[in-house]
Curated annotation (Swiss-Prot):
SUPFAM superfamilies, alphabetized: beta and beta-prime subunits of DNA dependent RNA-polymerase
Enzyme class: transferase
Coiled-coil blocks: none
Entry function: DNA-dependent RNA polymerase catalyzes the transcription of DNA into RNA using the four ribonucleoside triphosphates as substrates.
Residues noted as binding Zn(2+) in the record, renumbered to the chain: C224, C295, C302, C305
Enzyme nomenclature, EC number: 2.7.7.6
Main location: plastid
Protein name in the entry: DNA-directed RNA polymerase subunit beta''
GO molecular function, one term: zinc ion binding
GO biological process per UniProt: DNA-templated transcription
Subunit structure, as described in the record: In plastids the minimal PEP RNA polymerase catalytic core is composed of four subunits: alpha, beta, beta', and beta''. When a (nuclear-encoded) sigma factor is associated with the core the holoenzyme is formed, which can initiate transcription.
Species for this entry: Vitis vinifera (Grape)
Length: 1394
C-alpha cells in the first residue's frame, strides 16, 4: 500500500479544465503510449465518471439564467451616436454610400464583438455556475456565439444574397425582438435553413466529383525511387508552429538531415512527434519531405510518398485505396463548412484592422515628404506612408518614438496634439497574395427627381464611346438639381420658351386649357393674356389665325404649336455623342425665318475640343445630289487623311463614310438609278435588258430614267440598277478592253463609231458581257464637279467682321465624304452631300508655356428686346490657379469647407490672403488665360457674322478699388456687340464668377450700348433702378431675373428660395454664379446656410439658390446618364465597384473550395491561377528556348500552381476550424495538374495538337524520340479531369454517357480496368485490399507475351516505342520484386510505370 502511495505522489497532478480539444490530445497521446485496446478501457472509465458527475449536478436551464450584460446600454448608445454622425456626413456629401455601408457595418460588428467578450467576464464575475455559462464553454454543443445571441445582441444579419443588411438587430432573444428586427432575423434564419439543405447537397456532389477524379489511386509499391521532395523550413517565420507540426507528422523524409556533422534523421524515415520536436529545438536546416506530388507515377502511389496511414499510425499498407479516402476527407467536412453559415454570416473580415495608439499626450511630428494624402476606405482623410515612418511624440521633454509600417494610414496631421491612447494610425490587414477578394458592384439610386450635374470633367469609358457610361477621373460630387417636370395630360406643347419666367397661376391656366381641348383658340389667347402675367398688360392681341408668333413685351414668345418644333432657335440634333447645332437666327417680329445658311456648329457633349478638331461644317448646296451614283477621282491624287499634322479628330458619326482630304481640283459623279428590293419581290424586267423611262419594274415601282438594267442578288435583297447612256458595239474586242471602266476626257475622238466626232463632256466607259449576246460597251454620262479653292473664311463670313486674334486659328478644309469608286446610295428622297467644308479649330501658343491640348466650348443664348443672339465661347483656360502652401503656413491656406469636404467649384481666393497677393495672382492669371469668345449674331439679314475676340480685347476686373484698369474704358465699344467681360467661362459647370456680389456683372441695357461700371455698395443701389441686367446661369444661358415675381422655370418646378445677406464690408465669401454650396456652409454672417444647392441669382441683398443634393463619387465609379439629363426618383446614378475580402467569410466556405478545385475564376481579382499558369509558361519558354523551355516550364509551373492550390484550399478549411491533412488535398491537386496540352508545332506524328496527355508521358515520348514536343501545362477542373481519364467506362459512368461511349467506340479505345469504378461497373474484383494481389498476377500473365518478344529483339528504340504506345500496361511491384533480375525486364518496368 505504501508503495502505491509513493507512486501516487510521483504522478503529475493536472488541475485544468479539459475541453474537447484537450480531450483529443489526451486520447492521441494515450494511443501512442498504450495502443488501442488499453486506451478504450481508460476512456470507458472517463465516460462512466462523466455520467456520474452529470447526474449529481442535474443542470437545469430557466429563463432567469439568461442575464443581460449591464454595459450593453451605453455600448449600443455609443454605436448609434457614431452611426448618426456618419449619416450626417453622407447627407452632406462627404462620404459615399459604399464607405457609409462599410463603416456602419464595422461600427456594429465591433460593438457586437465587444459585447461578446464582455459576456464571458461578466458571467465569470457575477455567476460562475450559471448553467448557460457552463454549457456554452463546455465544448459539447452550442458555442459562445449562440449564447451571445441569447444574452448579448443578435447583431448584423445577411440577406439571402449574402450581402450585409446595415441595420443591426440590437435586441437579444431574451429581451425579445421588435417587428422589424424579427423580419430581418427571419431573413438570416431562413438563409441558414435553406443553406443547410442546399449546401449539404452541394457537399455531397463535391464529394462525388472528388472521388471520381482519384478513385483509381491505390498504394501499389513500397518505393518508387524518387529523389525529389518538397522543402519545409522551421526557421522561416511564415509558417506557424502548429501548421508546421501538422505538415510534418506522418510524412517520410526525402533526404538525410544533418545537425552539423551529426546525422539526426535518414532518408525514407517516417516522422513522428519526437522527431518533429527535435527539428524545432535544433532549428534544423530545411527539411525535404516526400509527398504525393513527388511520386513518380500518376496512376498510383507508393507507400513512402504517401507516409503514415491516418488510422493506425504506421506506414500505409499496400493495396490501400488512398484516393477514395482523400476524396471523402475533403468532401465530408464540406457539410460542416455549410452548417456554420448563419451565426455571424457575412461580416466584412477587413473590419478589424490593427490600430497604432499614441503612447502619451503630446505633439506629433513626422516627415511630410514621405506621406501622401489619401482617403481611407471609410472616406476619412488620411496620409498613406510608403515606407517605414518614424513618428515622434513630444510631451514635457520626453520624446516617444513610434514606428509605423509601410502601407499604413496615418490618421493625424503633423504638429497635431494627440491624447494618450488616441488612434494615430491604422495598419492595413496583411495582404496575402492569395487573399480572396471579389469585386462587388453597388448601385446608387437617386432620391429625388431633377437634373444631373457633374462638378468635374467626366470622361467616356473608351469601350462605350457612344453610350452613356462615364468614368470619374477623380473623387468629386454629382449633383441632382431639384425640379420636377410638368407632365401634361394630352400632347405636351408649351407656350413658354426655355428659361422664361412665369407666375404659378399662369402655369395652372396653361394646364387647364390644355386639358380641356374644346376651348377655341380665341378663348385661349384671351384667357392667357388676361390672366395678369406680370402685372402689366399691353400689346395688341391679334387673331390667332394670322399670327405666326406673338410679339409681347420683352419676355414672352408665343409660338404656334404647329411650328413649335421646327423653328425653335437652336435645333440640336443628337448624333451619338455630339451636338450638331445648325444656326438659324430668328428675328422676332418677322413672319418668315431667315434661310438657314447651312453652317452647323458641332460641339462634343462634354464641351471639350482637342487640337485640330472640327468646329463647324458647311454643306455647300452645289455639291448635293438627289440620285444615287458612284464618285470617281480619276487618276487625280486624293489620299485618305492619315498624315499626323492633317489628322482631324472626328468620331465617325454613323452615316459618315471615312473622309478623304481633297488635293483635287475636280471629281466626277456617275449617276445611276438604284432600287433595293426585298428578296421575295417579283421583278418584271430582265437582267441586261434595255428599258425606257417609266417602265414598270415591280408591281409598284417604275423607272425614272431609261437605260440598261443590271440585277444583283445579295443575301436577302435584290439590288436593281439602271445605267443611263449609249450602247456601242465595238468592232474589235481586244482593242476596247483597255477602255473598260475608265473616264474619257472631252476632246477625245470616238474611233469605232462611223462618224468621228469630238466629245463635249466627260464620259465613263464600262464594258458589259452578257451571257449569250455580243459583247458591248456602255457609255455613261458623267457629272463633273470642280472644287473651288476660293472657299475660305472670307466667303463664309464677310471680311470686315472676321478678326483672328492672338492664338486662335480657323482653317477651312474640304472633305469628300465618299471614297474613290464607292457606290453611294440615296435613301428614298434625301439628298446626298458629296463634299463637306469644315472649319478646323487650332491654336498657337508661346513656346514657354506648356501646351494646352484641349479647350472648352460652351453655348450661351442672350435674349434682349426682340432679338435673340447666340454666343459660342471657346476658351483656352487650362485651369484656375489654385494656391495652397504648406499646411502649417496660416497666411495662405486654401479654402476648405467647414464640413471637411473638398469643393471643386469654390474659387481658391479667400479672405485670408493679403490684398497684394491677390492682385499679383490676378495679374498672373491674366497672362495665363488666353481666352477667345466668338459671337455669332445677325447684324444684317443676308449673312451670318463671326467675331473672333481674344484675351487682348477682354479685360479682367478685380474686386478692389485700388486696382486701376484703364484699357477697358479706352476700348472702342461697338454698337450691338455685347462682350462678356470675363473670359473664364469654364466648362459647363462654372459660368461667371461674381466676387462679393458687386464687383462686376454682365450688363446689357435696353439701348444696346455696353455699359461697364464697377459699383461699390453705395452707388450700386441707384444704378440698380435704371438698369435691366442679365445674368448667366451655369448653362451659359443669360436671362433676366425679376426680383419681385415668384419665379418658376418651366418645365421644372424648381425649388427656389431666397437667402438674404446683411452685407457688411468684411463679408467676403466669394459667391459665384453656378457655384455649388454644401449644406451648413456659412456664406453670411447670420448663421449657416441650411440647404445645399446651386447659386442661380446673386442680387444686392440676397442670393437665389436652387436646392440640390450632392452625391459623392470616388475615382473609377461609373456615372450613368448624361450631363443635364433629367432623372426621376429611383433612377441609377452611379455604380461603385469595390473590393470585398471573402477569405474568412463563413458563407463563402464551400463554394470557395469548389471554385478552387474546378479552377474557375469567378470575380476573383487577386487569385486567377489560370492566368498565372499561362504567365509562368510563357516566361520560362521565352528565357530558355524551345526544348528545355517546355520541359522546365511545365515542371516549374506545375510545382508552383500545386503549392498555391493546396494553400488556398487549406486556408478555407482552417478558417472554419476543420483540420485536414495536406496529403489528401495533395492527391487531388496532383490529378488536376498532371496533364499537359499539346501545342500546334512539333510531334504531329504521335499526338494531335490540342490533345491532353500526362506530363510524364510527354517527357518520356520526348526522350524516346529525341526531339522536342511542344506542350504547355493546363489546369483541369475536377469535372474535366474526371472526363479525361484513361478509362472510358469510368468517364461514361460519371457524366455525358452517350457522348463518351460513342467517342470511345469510334476511336477504338481500350480500357485496361485499372481503377475501382470500372471493375465495380463490370462486376469484377476491385484491385484494392485483398483483390490487389490477384491483379498483380493477372497483369504478369498479360505481359508475358511482349516480354518474350522483347528479349529476342535487342533494339532498344523499338522496345521504347512499343512501351510508349502500350503505356497502359503496367507492372506492379509487390513484395516479390526480387524475382526480376533480367535487365531487359528492368528497363521495361522503368518505362512502364506511368
Amino acid at each position: 500500500m505504501g508503495v502505491l502511495m509513493t507512486e501516487r505522489a510521483n504522478l503529475v497532478f493536472h488541475n485544468k479544465v479539459i475541453d474537447g480539444t484537450a480531450m483529443k490530445r489526451l486520447i492521441s497521446r494515450l494511443i501512442d503510449h498504450f495502443g488501442m485496446a488499453y486506451t478504450s478501457h481508460i476512456l470507458d472509465q472517463v465516460k462512466t465518471l462523466g455520467f456520474q458527475q452529470a447526474t449529481a449536478t442535474s443542470i437545469s436551464l430557466g429563463i432567469d439564467d439568461l442575464l443581460t450584460i449591464p454595459s450593453k446600454g451605453w455600448l449600443v448608445q455609443d454605436a448609434e451616436q457614431q452611426s448618426l454622425i456618419l449619416e450626417k456626413h453622407h447627407h452632406y456629401g462627404n462620404v459615399h454610400a459604399v464607405e457609409k455601408l462599410r463603416q456602419s457595418i464595422e461600427i456594429w460588428y465591433a460593438t457586437s464583438e465587444y459585447l461578446r467578450q464582455e459576456m464571458n467576464t461578466n458571467f465569470r464575475m457575477t455567476d460562475p455556475f450559471n448553467p448557460v455559462h457552463i454549457m456554452s464553454f463546455s465544448g459539447a454543443r452550442g458555442n459562445a456565439s449562440q449564447v451571445h445571441q441569447l444574452v448579448g445582441m443578435r447583431g448584423l444579419m445577411s440577406d439571402p444574397q449574402g450581402q450585409m443588411i446595415d441595420l443591426p438587430i440590437q435586441s437579444n432573444l431574451r429581451e425579445g425582438l421588435s417587428l422589424t428586427e424579427y423580419i430581418i432575423s427571419c431573413y438570416g434564419a431562413r438563409k441558414g435553413v435553406v443553406d443547410t439543405a442546399v449546401r449539404t447537397s452541394d457537399a455531397g456532389y463535391l464529394t462525388r466529383r472528388l472521388v471520381e477524379v482519384v478513385q483509381h489511386i491505390v498504394v501499389r509499391r513500397t518505393d518508387c525511387g524518387t529523389i525529389r521532395g518538397i522543402s519545409v523550413s522551421p526557421r522561416n517565420g511564415m509558417i506557424p508552429e502548429r501548421i508546421f507540426i501538422q505538415t510534418l507528422i506522418g510524412r517520410v523524409l526525402a533526404d538525410d538531415i544533418y545537425m552539423g556533422p551529426r546525422c539526426i534523421a535518414i532518408r525514407n524515415q517516417d516522422i513522428g512527434i519526437g522527431l518533429v520536436n527535435r527539428f524545432i529545438t535544433f532549428q534544423a536546416q530545411t527539411i525535404s519531405i516526400r509527398t504525393p506530388f513527388t511520386c513518380k507515377s500518376t496512376s498510383w502511389i507508393c507507400r513512402l510518398c504517401y507516409g503514415r496511414s491516418p488510422t493506425h499510425g504506421d506506414l500505409v499498407e499496400l493495396g490501400e485505396a488512398v484516393g477514395i479516402i482523400a476524396g471523402q476527407s475533403i468532401g465530408e467536412p464540406g457539410t460542416q463548412l455549410t452548417l456554420r453559415t448563419f451565426h455571424t454570416g457575412g461580416v466584412f473580415t477587413g473590419g478589424t484592422a490593427e490600430h497604432v495608439r499614441a503612447p502619451s499626450n503630446g505633439k506629433i511630428k513626422f516627415n511630410e515628404d514621405w506621406v501622401h494624402p489619401t482617403r481611407t476606405r471609410h472616406g476619412h482623410p488620411a496620409f498613406l506612408c510608403y515606407i517605414d515612418l518614424y513618428v515622434t511624440i513630444e510631451s514635457e521633454g520626453i520624446i516617444h518614438n513610434v514606428n509605423i509600417p509601410p502601407k499604413s494610414f496615418l490618421l493625424v496631421q503633423n504638429d497635431q496634439y494627440v491624447e494618450s491612447e488616441q488612434v494615430i494610425a491604422e495598419i492595413r490587414a496583411g495582404t496575402y497574395t492569395f487573399n480572396f477578394k471579389e469585386r462587388v458592384r453597388k448601385h446608387i439610386y437617386s432620391d429625388s427627381e431633377g437634373e444631373m450635374h457633374w462638378s468635374t470633367d467626366v470622361y467616356h469609358a473608351p469601350e462605350f464611346t457612344y453610350g452613356n457610361v462615364h468614368l470619374l477621373p477623380k473623387t468629386s460630387h454629382l449633383w441632382i438639381l431639384s425640379g420636377g417636370s410638368c407632365r401634361f395630360s394630352i400632347v405636351p406643347f408649351s407656350i413658354h420658351k426655355d428659361q422664361d419666367q412665369m407666375s404659378v397661376r399662369s402655369l395652372s391656366v396653361e394646364r387647364r386649357y390644355i386639358s380641356n381641348p374644346s376651348v377655341t383658340n380665341d378663348q385661349v389667347i384671351h384667357e392667357f393674356f388676361s390672366s395678369d402675367l406680370s402685372g402689366k398688360k399691353e400689346g395688341r392681341i391679334p387673331a390667332y389665325s394670322e399670327l405666326n408668333r406673338i410679339i409681347y413685351t420683352g419676355r414672352y414668345n408665343l409660338i404656334d404649336p404647329a411650328i413649335l418644333h421646327e423653328n425653335s432657335d437652336l435645333l440640336a440634333k443628337r448624333r451619338r455623342n455630339r451636338f450638331i447645332i445648325p444656326f438659324q437666327s430668328i428675328q422676332e417680329g418677322e413672319k418668315e425665318l431667315m434661310p438657314p445658311s447651312g453652317i452647323s456648329i458641332e460641339i462634343p457633349i462634354n464641351g471639350i475640343f482637342r487640337r485640330n478638331s472640327i468646329l463647324a461644317y458647311f454643306d455647300d448646296p452645289r455639291y448635293r445630289r438627289n440620285s444615287s451614283g458612284i464618285t470617281k477621282y480619276g487618276t487625280i491624287e486624293a489620299h485618305s487623311i492619315v498624315k499626323k499634322e492633317d489628322l482631324i479628330e472626328y468620331r465617325g458619326v454613323k452615316e459618315f463614310k471615312p473622309k478623304y482630304q481633297m488635293k483635287v481640283d475636280r471629281f466626277f459623279f456617275i449617276p445611276e438609278e438604284v432600287h433595293i428590293l426585298p428578296g421575295s419581290a417579283s421583278i418584271m424586267v430582265r437582267n441586261n435588258s434595255i428599258i425606257g423611262v417609266d417602265t414598270r419594274i415591280t408591281l409598284n415601282t417604275r423607272s425614272r430614267v431609261s437605260g440598261l438594267v443590271r440585277v444583283e442578288r445579295k443575301k436577302k435583297r435584290i439590288e436593281l440598277k439602271i445605267f443611263s447612256g449609249d450602247i456601242q458595239f465595238p468592232g474589235e474586242t481586244n482593242k476596247i478592253s483597255r477602255h473598260i471602266g475608265i473616264l474619257i476626257p472631252p476632246g477625245t475622238r470616238k474611233k469605232n463609231s462611223k462618224e468621228s466626232k469630238k466629245l463635249k463632256n466627260w464620259i465613263y466607259v464600262q464594258g458589259i458581257t452578257p451571257t449569250k449576246k455580243k459583247y458591248f460597251v456602255l457609255v455613261r454620262p458623267v457629272v463633273t464637279y470642280e472644287i473651288a479653292d476660293g472657299i475660305n473664311l472670307a466667303t463664309l463670313f464677310p471680311q470686315d467682321l472676321l478678326q483672328e486674334r492672338d492664338n486662335m486659328h480657323l482653317q477651312v478644309v474640304n472633305y469628300i465624304l465618299y471614297g474613290n469608286g464607292k457606290p453611294i446610295r440615296g435613301i428614298s428622297d434625301t439628298s446626298i452631300q458629296l463634299v463637306r467644308t469644315c472649319l478646323v479649330l487650332n491654336w498657337y501658343q508661346e513656346k514657354k508655356s506648356s501646351p494646352i491640348e484641349k479647350t472648352h466650348a460652351s453655348f450661351m443664348e442672350v435674349r434682349t428686346n426682340g432679338l435673340i443672339r447666340d454666343f459660342l465661347t471657346i476658351n483656352l483656360v487650362k485651369s484656375y490657379i489654385s494656391y495652397t502652401g504648406k499646411r502649417n503656413d496660416p497666411s495662405s491656406s486654401g479654402l476648405i469647407a467647414d464640413n471637411g469636404s473638398d469643393h471643386t467649384n469654390i474659387n481658391p481666393f479667400y479672405s485670408i490672403y493679403p490684398k497684394e497677393r491677390i492682385q499679383q495672382l490676378l495679374r498672373q492669371r491674366q497672362k495665363k488665360n488666353q481666352g477667345t469668345i466668338r459671337t455669332l449674331l445677325n447684324r444684317n439679314k443676308e449673312c451670318q457674322s463671326l467675331i473672333i475676340l481674344s484675351s487682348s480685347n477682354c479685360s479682367r476686373m478685380g474686386p478692389f478699388n485700388d486696382v486701376k484698369y484703364h484699357n477697358v474704358i479706352k476700348e472702342s465699344i461697338k454698337k450691338d456687340t455685347p462682350i462678356p467681360i470675363r473670359n473664364s467661362l469654364g466648362p459647363l459647370g462654372t459660368a461667371l464668377q461674381i466676387t462679393n456680389f458687386y464687383s462686376f456683372y454682365h450688363l446689357i441695357t435696353h439701348n444696346h450700348i455696353l455699359v461697364t461700371k464697377y459699383f461699390q455698395l453705395d452707388n450700386f443701389k441707384q444704378t440698380f433702378q435704371t438698369l435691366k441686367y442679365y445674368l448667366m446661369d451655369e448653362n451659359g444661358i443669360t436671362y433676366n431675373p425679376d426680383p419681385c415675381s415668384n419665379i418658376i422655370l418651366n418645365p421644372f418646378n424648381l425649388n427656389w428660395y431666397f437667402l438674404h445677406h446683411n452685407y457688411c464690408e468684411e463679408t467676403s465669401t466669394i459667391i459665384s454664379l453656378g457655384q455649388f454650396i454644401c449644406e451648413n456652409v456659412c456664406i453670411a454672417k447670420n448663421g449657416p446656410h441650411l440647404k445645399s444647392g446651386q447659386v442661380l441669382i446673386v442680387q444686392v441683398d440676397s442670393v437665389v439658390i436652387r436646392s440640390a443634393k450632392p452625391y459623392l463619387a470616388t475615382l473609377g465609379a461609373t456615372v450613368h446618364g448624361h450631363y443635364g439629363e433629367i432623372l426621376y426618383e429611383g433612377d441609377t446614378l452611379v455604380t461603385f465597384i469595390y473590393e470585398k475580402s471573402r477569405s474568412g467569410d463563413i458563407t463563402q466556405g464551400l463554394p470557395k473550395v469548389e471554385q478552387v478545385l474546378e479552377v474557375r475564376s469567378i470575380d476573383s481579382i487577386s487569385m486567377n491561377l489560370e492566368k498565372r499558369v499561362e504567365g509562368w509558361n510563357e516566361h520560362i519558354t521565352r528565357i530558355l528556348g524551345i526544348p528545355w523551355g517546355f520541359f522546365i516550364g511545365a515542371e516549374l509551373t506545375i510545382a508552383q500552381s500545386r503549392i498555391s492550390l493546396v494553400n488556398k484550399i487549406q486556408k478555407v478549411y482552417r478558417s472554419q476550424g476543420v483540420q485536414i491533412h495536406n496529403r489528401h488535398i495533395e492527391i487531388i491537386v496532383r490529378q488536376i495538374t498532371s496533364k499537359v496540352l499539346v501545342s500546334e508545332d512539333g510531334m504531329s506524328n504521335v499526338f494531335s495538337p490540342g490533345e491532353l496527355i500526362g506530363l510524364l508521358r510527354a517527357e518520356r515520348t520526348g526522350r524516346a524520340f529525341e526531339e522536342a514536343i511542344c506542350y504547355r501545362t493546363i489546369l483541369l477542373g475536377i469535372t474535366r479531369a474526371s472526363l479525361n481519364t484513361q478509362s472510358f467506362i469510368s468517364e461514361a459512368s460519371f457524366q455525358e454517357t452517350a457522348r463518351v461511349l460513342a467517342k470511345a467506340a469510334l476511336w477504338g479505345r481500350i480500357d485496361w480496368l485499372k481503377g475501382l469504378k470500372e471493375n465495380v461497373v463490370l462486376g469484377g474484383m476491385i484491385p484494392v485490399g485483398t483483390g490487389f494481389k490477384g491483379l498483380v498476377h493477372r497483369s504478369r500473365q498479360h505481359n508475358n507475351i511482349p516480354l518474350e518478344m522483347e528479349t529476342k529483339k535487342n533494339n532498344l528504340f523499338e522496345r521504347e516505342m512499343r512501351d510508349i504506345l502500350f503505356h497502359h500496361r503496367e507492372l506492379f511491384d509487390s513484395c516479390s520484386s526480387k524475382n526480376f533480375h533480367d535487365t531487359s525486364e528492368q528497363s521495361f518496368m522503368g518505362f512502364n510505370d506511368s
